[in-house]
Amino acid sequence: MEAFPTEYFLGTAVRLLENVKYRDSNYTREERVENLQYAYNKAAAHFAQERQQQILKVSPKRLEASLRTIVGMVVYSWAKVSKELMADLSIHYTYTLILDDSEDDPHPQMLTYFDDLQSGNPQKHPWWMLVNEHFPNVLRHFGPFCSLNLIRSTLDFFEGCWIEQYNFHGFPGSFDYPGFLRRMNGLGHCVGGSLWPKENFNEQEHFLEITSAIAQMENWMVWVNDLMSFYKEFDDPRDQTSLVKNYVVSEGITLNQALEKLTQDTLQSSEQMMVVFSQKDPKIMDTIECFMHGYITWHLCDNRYRLKEIYDRTKDIQTEDAMKFRKFYEQAFKVGAIEATEWAYPTVVERLEQRKAEEQAERDEQAALANPEKAQVAQVVLA
C-alpha cells in the first residue's frame, strides 16, 4: 500500500479553497443550528416510521449516522432555500446515501421496473418504492424542468450504484469509463437542479442560467467530493472504485498522476464556475457561491471525511500549504463544527423506543377495555 500523499493533498486543497475564494458566511451560528434542527426533526420522524423501518431494514445506528451526514450537507450547502425544502431534500438524499452503502444485488427486483412504472404499480425494489412515495414532497418545490433533472439524475444514481456493486475499475484503455460512472452516480444534475426552487426562481425566466449551472455543477460538486473524499477512501476496502483509482486502471497511470488529473479538472471547473456566473444575475451567483462555500465547509467539518486527521497531521509541518490549510480548516471549523447533540434529537432510536412504548400502552388499554373485571382487580392490587 502506497503512503498517503499528504503534502500533495494539502497543496490541492489550498488551491481549491483559494480558487473559490472560500469564506463561508452563510449563517449565524443560531441560524445554522435552527435549520439543522428543523431538517433533522422532519427527516428523523420520516425514517422512524414503521413502514420505513420494515422496508429499508437498516440498523437505527447506521440510519442515524446517514441522517446526520446528509442533514449537515443540505443545510450547509442549500443555504438559500426554505427550511421545508431543506427537510425534504434531506430525506431524499438520505435515501441515496443508504443506497450508496448497500451491498444488495438489485437485479431480481428490477426485472419489471418499466412495466410497473408504465402501469402505475408499486415498484418491487424497496428503495424505489419508498423514494417514489417521497418524491412528490420534493418535486412540489420545483418547476417542471428542474423536476425532470431531479428524477433523471436519481435514476442515473441508482444505475451507478448498481455498477459499483461489481467493484469494476474499467478495462485498461477504456478512458471514458471513469467519467461515465462518476457522472452517473454523482447526482450532479439532481444537486444542480435542486438549487432553484420555484419559490425563489422563475425557471422560464432564468432557463439559460439554470441550465448552465446544472451543467457546471455536474462536474464541480462530484470532483470536489472526490478530492475531499480521497483521504477517507485511500485505504478503505469499501471505496476501491473511486474516480482516482479508476483513472489508475483505465489510463494506466500512477496514483499521483490520477490525483493530479482530478486536481486540474476540479480547479478548472472552479474557475469556470466563478467566471461564467460572475456577470450574471447576482441572485444566481449568490446561490452558487453560497452552495460552493457551504459544501466545502460540510466536507471539512463532517466526521465522515476524517479531514481533522489531516489537520492534526499538519500541526508540525511549517510549509506554506500546511499553514494555509490549517487557516482554512480553522475558519471552516469555527462556523461549521456544531455537535450533533445540539440539533439531532430525539434520535431515531429514541423515536422508535417512544413509539414502542406508546403501542404497548395502547395494547394495555385495549386489553383493559376487553376485560374490565381483570383490570379492576389489577387496580385494587395496585391500590
From Swiss-Prot:
Pathway: Sesquiterpene biosynthesis; trichothecene biosynthesis. The keyword Lyase applies. Its EC number is 4.2.3.6. Pfam families: TRI5. GO terms for biological process: sesquiterpenoid biosynthetic process. It catalyses: (2E,6E)-farnesyl diphosphate = trichodiene + diphosphate. Keywords: Lyase. It is an enzyme of class 4 (lyase). The keyword Lyase applies. GO terms for molecular function: trichodiene synthase activity. TS is a member of the terpene cyclase group of enzymes. It catalyzes the isomerization and cyclization of farnesyl pyro-phosphate to form trichodiene, the first cyclic intermediate in the biosynthetic pathway for trichothecenes. It serves to branch trichothecene biosynthesis from the isoprenoid pathway. Trichothecenes are sesquiterpenoid toxins that act by inhibiting protein biosynthesis. Belongs to the trichodiene synthase family. This is Trichodiene synthase. It comes from Stachybotrys chartarum.
